[in-house]
Each structure stands twice: as C-alpha cells, then as structure tokens.
Amino acid sequence: MFKAGALWLLILGAVHSTSLFIKQVPANDTERQILDLMTSYRFNLSGSLRSMSDLMRGFSVAFMLAPLAFGVLDLVLSRERAGLLKRVALVQIIWLAAMIVVALRYFFAVPLSFLVVALLIFVLAWLKLPADASN
C-alpha cells in the first residue's frame, strides 16, 4: 500500500502539472476583465512587482512539486524497514489531512478528490504496516 501511495502522489503531481500548460480562456467580458487585471496589475511585494497571476502560478507550481517530491521520497524509502515506513506514512497522513482542509476551503472537487484518495491509501498503508519492533 505504501508504494501505491507513492505512485498516487506522482500521478497527482503529474495531473496537476497539466494545468500549467492550459491557457485560461475567458467565457465572457467580465472574465476577460478579471484575467486581464490578474496578469497586468502588479503588487509591490517588498520591492518585487508580482501580478496575481504570478502568485497563483507560483502556488500552483509548489502544489505540483510537493506531491512529486513526496512521491519520489516514498519510492526511495519503500524498501526500508516497516517501522520507518509506518512513521513516514503517518507524516504523509498529517500532511495530506492539512492539504484536504485547505482544499475544502479553497479548491474544487478534482484536486480535493485526488488528495482524499491519497490520504485513504496512506491510512490503509499505516494500518497495514507493523510497528517497528526495535522501539
């Protein structure tokens, strides 16, 4: 199950990366105005001029990199002893639960569903993995 969780995180990151290549097309004049302002109006953030579009792109890239990095880390660790994997699965559970709280407030159904599936896989992995006998 642990390796399945790692693979699911890689899928999550890969699917999210596709959003970085899709250009938003406004459906009406209001959306056109919003998108124009999001890309053209710049905020002075401690001397750096950034648009709302820049900020959203940065957060989107970070959201893509986190599951990719955690998925790779999990694959690298997947052959380690069960006790370590159980602790890493718990860390994944905590991180994913926090992400789900954020997703419930700010995201929509697709990213939320991917996060929930990842959480369920790691909960099952945690339940299935035996505790480390050396502790």
Residue ranges and their predicted role:
Residues V117-L129:
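Alpha-helical transmembrane segments and their membrane-interface exit regions
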